[in-house]
Design a protein with these regions (language model features):
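Structured, non-catalytic alpha/beta "coupling" segments that mediate domain-domain communication
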Residues: 2-33
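Residue-level signal for the short linker/turn that defines the boundary of a DNA-recognition helix
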Residues: 12-14, 69, 85, 249
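Mobile-element integrase/transposase regions
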Residues: 52, 80, 84-147, 153, ...
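RNase H-like two-metal-ion nuclease catalytic core shared by retroviral integrases
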Residues: 46, 195-197, 203-210, 217-240, ...
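Mobile genetic element proteins and their domesticated derivatives, centered on retroelements
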Residues: 18-22, 29, 57, 74, ...
């Protein structure tokens, strides 16, 4: 096109004008006009070219009595055979030809796009629970929390010396007694609990307790803490306002401080997504609707 003669001026259009009209960079055009360069490995070739060295690597893997040997041991066996080459070259060739030792890639996972929401429309629909730790003069203590995903209300807080599956149930028991009026079989039907895949939450005792209360287990995706984000966010608030700023002599003192923090948090902490209302105000506003739905 640049060599085409203009009928009005009698001169060729020129490369600069054509690139400007077509909105194309001249550097890109010059680059594609050059013949492609043959790709060659940089540096010295070594004692063997790549095809022959790959054949030696395959022979080592075939004759080795062990399975799963990686590129480092293959490189060492090459040196024992008198073939001296670099470790990176052995790694590159084994990677290109699929000869590396199998790694723990895990099971194939589905879509991981976090394009949904973990915030339900009403209270007492989805609670989240998680565990953190705190230090006292008696040693480390396990701190368990339970949070309503809709209102961000803390429905349960507990501290214990041991972070067992039985201690992990205490925040949920607190919330069920207060918001469902007791502790009986099927009393919390319609509630789901979001938790991670920790040993406490996946234990038979924990899951049996949920089924007894009528609670549906809702585990988050593996290695996806966003699914339990409400409990994670509350733990951050708890650390910044209590666990990291106060010293506790005993675990019992910590437990009592957690109960006091729960009352203060629910009555004074402001939730931005609800128009800067407190969790207690959100619950009070929805109580008539919840009672009618029940």
């Amino acid at each position: 096109m640049s060599r085409t003669v203009s009928p009005s001026s009698g001169t060729s259009y020129g490369l600069a004008r054509v690139c400007r009209i077509w909105r194309m960079a001249r550097t890109t055009l010059y680059r594609h006009r050059q013949p492609p360069l043959a790709r060659q490995r940089r540096g010295p070739i070594g004692p063997l070219p790549d095809p022959m060295l790959t054949a030696e690597i395959r022979a080592i893997l075939a004759t080795s009595p062990f399975h799963g040997e990686g590129h480092r041991k293959v490189w060492a066996r090459l040196r024992m055979m008198g073939i001296r080459t670099s470790l990176r070259r052995v790694l590159r060739l084994m990677r290109e030809h699929g000869l590396l030792a199998p790694s723990r890639t895990g099971a194939p996972r589905g879509p991981r796009n976090h394009d949904g929401t973990i915030i339900p429309e009403t209270i007492d629909t989805l609670w989240g629970t998680d565990m953190t730790t705190a230090w006292t003069a008696e040693g480390q203590a396990a701190v368990f929390v339970a949070v309503d995903h809709h209102s961000a209300e803390c429905v349960g807080l507990h501290a214990s010396r041991q972070g067992t599956r039985f201690e992990a149930l205490e925040p949920l028991r607190q919330g069920v007694r207060e918001h469902f009026g007791g502790f009986a079989k099927g009393i919390a039907s319609g509630l789901s609990v979001r938790h991670d895949h920790g040993s406490q939450y996946m234990s038979r005792a924990f899951q049996d307790e949920l089924r007894f209360l009528g609670i549906a287990s809702s585990p988050a995706f593996v290695r996806a803490p966003e699914g339990n984000g409400c409990a994670e966010r509350f733990i951050r608030t708890l650390k910044e306002n209590l666990l990291w700023v106060r010293h506790f002599e005993t675990i019992e003192e910590l437990r009592q401080a957690l109960l006091a923090f729960r009352e203060s948090y629910n009555s004074t902490w402001l939730i931005a997504r609800h128009g800067f209302q407190t969790p207690a105000a959100i619950r009070h506003k929805q109580l008539p609707c919840a009672a009618l739905a029940a």
